[in-house]
From Swiss-Prot:
Task of the protein: DNA-dependent RNA polymerase catalyzes the transcription of DNA into RNA using the four ribonucleoside triphosphates as substrates. Component of RNA polymerase I which synthesizes ribosomal RNA precursors. A14 seems to play a role in the stability of Pol I subunit A43 and association of rrn3 to Pol I.
Lineage of producing organism: Eukaryota, Fungi, Dikarya, Ascomycota, Taphrinomycotina
Subunit structure: Component of the RNA polymerase I (Pol I) complex consisting of 14 subunits. Part of a Pol I subcomplex consisting of the subunits A14 and A43. Interacts with rpa43.
Claim: Transcription is one of the keywords in the record: yes
Basic residues biased stretches: 112-124
Protein modification: Phosphorylated.
Record's compositionally biased regions (Basic and acidic residues): 87-111, 125-135
Organism from which the protein derives: Schizosaccharomyces pombe (strain 972 / ATCC 24843) (Fission yeast)
Protein name according to UniProt: DNA-directed RNA polymerase I subunit rpa14
Chain intervals with Low complexity compositional bias: 74-84
Alphabetical keyword list: DNA-directed RNA polymerase, Nucleus, Phosphoprotein, Transcription
Subcellular localization(s) per the UniProt record: Nucleus, Nucleolus
Any single GO CC term annotated in Swiss-Prot or TrEMBL for this entry: RNA polymerase I complex
Gene coding for it: ker1
One Gene Ontology term from the biological process aspect of the record: transcription by RNA polymerase I
Region (Disordered): 71-147
Length: 147
């Protein structure tokens, strides 16, 4: 369903408006936009937002927004960690990573290159071993089927 857009309202004054003039302008705009408001919008509608601004400009008390959502507690499986503990674990992690990075800083360039190559070789060996182990298990299954 296509919704029509409200007509644009142009403010023809270049000077700053005071609260009364602003509220009058906003009130006119709200009246214009009311016809085009979709009542099925997800959260607070544009119209209700504008009405809240108008209430502020008029100096009225603004009610709290209620979304009529059911209040639910956390599921029993969920662990609730206080924010203080969260900060501590993040700091510990960042210190751990900083230590790992700083271990390589004091080494010279050649040593860093050598360590990098050794890490790559070790990773390659692990991959090859995993492939061989996988191939051995698939061959063993194939031989049993032939027997």
């Amino acid at each position: 369903m296509a919704t029509e857009c409200p007509p644009k309202m142009i403010l023809r004054k270049s000077e700053k408006l005071d609260k009364d003039a602003s509220s009058k302008f906003l009130n006119r705009y709200i009246q214009t936009i009311e016809r085009f408001q979709d009542e099925k919008s997800g959260s607070e509608s544009v119209l209700s937002q504008l009405n809240r601004v108008l209430m502020y400009l008029k100096g009225e008390e603004i009610p709290l927004i209620s979304l009529n959502l059911p209040v639910q507690g956390p599921p029993t499986e969920e662990l609730i960690i206080p924010p203080e503990e969260m900060l501590e674990t993040k700091e510990e992690e960042s210190l751990k990573h900083a230590r790992e990075e700083n271990d390589d800083l004091h080494l010279d360039k050649e040593t860093k290159k050598r360590l990098k190559k050794e890490k790559k070789k070790a990773a390659r060996r692990e991959k090859e071993e995993a492939r061989k182990a996988k191939a051995d298990t698939t061959q063993g299954v194939g031989e049993k089927e032939q027997s």
